[in-house]
Amino acid sequence: LYTLREMRANVLARLPVEAALLTETEHALIVQLILCGGQARIDGWQELSAAESLLRRLWCTLEVDEQDVLLHLPRELMIPLSLILREQRHQELRSRLLFFDTDTKAALYLSGMLSAKQALSRLYESVLHDSYANDEALALRYLKAGNDFYYNRAGELFLLHPGLADPEKILREGGFPMGYQPDLPSERALMASRDLLPEEFETDAQLSALLDSCMGLETAEESSAHDLRILVKQHVTWSELMEVVRAMLPIPPTKELTACLHRLYAFTPRWGTYR
């Protein structure tokens, strides 16, 4: 068993490596804690998940009152973390992680899911192989903390696009996911990381406008067209798509909207089919 002093020494010793492999939300929360004198109000489930991760690292404590959830960073860690975040090696590694995350989000949008083994290999190849943060356990935790994930029946770990409802269906209908695309142009990769491809842009814009018209500007949701596109990627039938659309709208779909949905259904690449 560790003594309290030994636990504190271990936390301090691992601080640079742990800080290097924080997720984007965890890293932003640490910056906020430092800027706010060691206290930050937690807002939303993403920040709460990040706060719980910092608790497990023994960095922070959580305080819950009637109105707020407050995260506290002890003074003993504020100065060391502040210095670490300013180090050039930390900033360079975080910059490489940003490119890795963009590639991973693009791969997930193109494929729906991604082998964690391939993602881990890519993370080592592009970020960690020659760095001070070469720690496989932390690298795997980074992947799982920053993405939805799933274990198949064989125990293999996959990272998932957040819109994917049934990973087993993708594996059944399309085989193994295509993974990273090393020759993907940077502009295309950036758009894919934001859940849109250049060839999908026009239909997406038209569909958004038509949905706005049918739903009324006061009730229209910006994500509706995106949600329908993600649904089509998952091999739903035309009748299933139209059932969802009718449930969304206060009026029957117009001819223009139906025609646009036909284009969406015909030309949206399905996950697992590579077309």
Predicted feature residues:
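Short amphipathic alpha-helical interface segments
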Residues: 12-47, 99-127
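Short alpha-helical segments that sit at the start of domains
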Residues: 3-26, 86-101, 199-203, 216-218
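Short amphipathic alpha-helical interaction segments
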Residues: 41-65, 130-142
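Short, charged/polar micro-motifs that form catalytic or ligand-binding hotspots
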Residues: 20, 40-44, 90, 94, ...
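Long, highly charged low-complexity segments enriched in Glu/Asp and Lys/Arg with interspersed Ser/Thr
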Residues: 251-275
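Long, charge-rich C-terminal accessory regions
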Residues: 131-244
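Accessory beta->alpha helical hairpin/"wing" motif in late/C-terminal subdomains of nucleic-acid enzymes
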Residues: 2-12, 61-90, 152-174
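Short, amphipathic alpha-helical interaction segments positioned at domain boundaries
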Residues: 74-110, 165-193
